[in-house]
């Protein structure tokens, strides 16, 4: 596969590389310690990866409803892990270590809109968030805070027949798009003001501040880019999970394509290029942007009606396929080593049913991504369609980031990479590929 990576270097044109991407922001989900078996990750297993990472983002803290204070989501775990993580600076003195808040880990069914409530809060309530953040960061030796606020998301693409597509286009002439947040403009201004106040407080305390744009959070709704970017040390674009089996149960497609594929009524903003260009065209310096890559894949369940070819868009899917046995964190989610073990070159061809290998289909254009599939059997069972970025395609995205003059790559996250070397014997293959092709 390496020859394809050199091919993409030519495709993107080395002459367009304005400046080498240097950042490798590595996210670490602390709950990986609570997993079972081979997915359980200890802090000492981070060492090999951290020789490549420039930043480590520890996830995740939460926002306490009511008081709007920053707080630990798992006190029993974090009271030990905070110190263990920040102590890594002794081995890696150049490493910047930040604490992330939100990140879709702050599940609060009673207060699902509490991050919007923080934006709408008065200055006194917002000061609770700022003060509690500074105390927690300073007490535990973090270099700064990463804002991965769980703001309202774009509505998922709906499946329409030809008549439905025509009617939707006709209806939009009169009604426009569905409004997710009618106060988005107000919230954009409030977010800008809040970030400015956080930055002013952090500046005197010598603390960093970064932003993570979570998947499907609409940047046009909440982020006033020209006013915001000076307040952040860097901005991480989680440019993946554009489609998932939970958001899009009836059709499977590339979850993180680099470019727009103008076919089958795809939406033009569901790709890396659109997201990156939005920030660049709104005057955010490229060196402040880090392109987010997922080290996991998303799997749909195929039906007999889904067909045999697997060429996306795949219709008549039935939601999420079973998730990884080791991770057990979400339906349809598999870590890279779990994906690797299921591919036909690594799994026995003699297996049948749910253990039968998946056939990998490589994107020779290197624009959209790779996928793997196992068609449903004669009873409509065991069908799987899986979209993922393997180490090679992660390297291609690193080259893309260089071609756009971006600051680097943000990897979500280390615990989903092959940190044990189960696939090929090499540990952290995705991290290594990204670092190699960033130069």
From Swiss-Prot:
CDD domains: GH18_IDGF. The lineage of its organism: Eukaryota, Metazoa, Ecdysozoa, Arthropoda, Hexapoda. Glycans are attached at residues 122, 218, 346. Its main location: secreted. It comes from Drosophila simulans (Fruit fly). GO terms for molecular function: chitin binding; chitinase activity; imaginal disc growth factor receptor binding. Keywords: Developmental protein, Disulfide bond, Glycoprotein, Secreted, Signal. Lacks the typical Glu active site in position 150 that is replaced by a Gln residue, preventing the hydrolase activity. Its precise function remains unclear. Cooperates with insulin-like peptides to stimulate the proliferation, polarization and motility of imaginal disk cells. May act by stabilizing the binding of insulin-like peptides to its receptor through a simultaneous interaction with both molecules to form a multiprotein signaling complex. Residues 22-439 form the GH18 domain. It comes from the Eukaryota. Residues 1-20 form the signal peptide. SMART domains: Glyco_18 (SM00636). Glycosylated. Belongs to the glycosyl hydrolase 18 family. IDGF subfamily. This is Chitinase-like protein Idgf1. GO terms for biological process: carbohydrate metabolic process; chitin catabolic process; chitin-based cuticle development; ecdysis, chitin-based cuticle; epithelium regeneration; imaginal disc development; regulation of stem cell division; wound healing. Disulfide bonds join 26-53, 340-423.
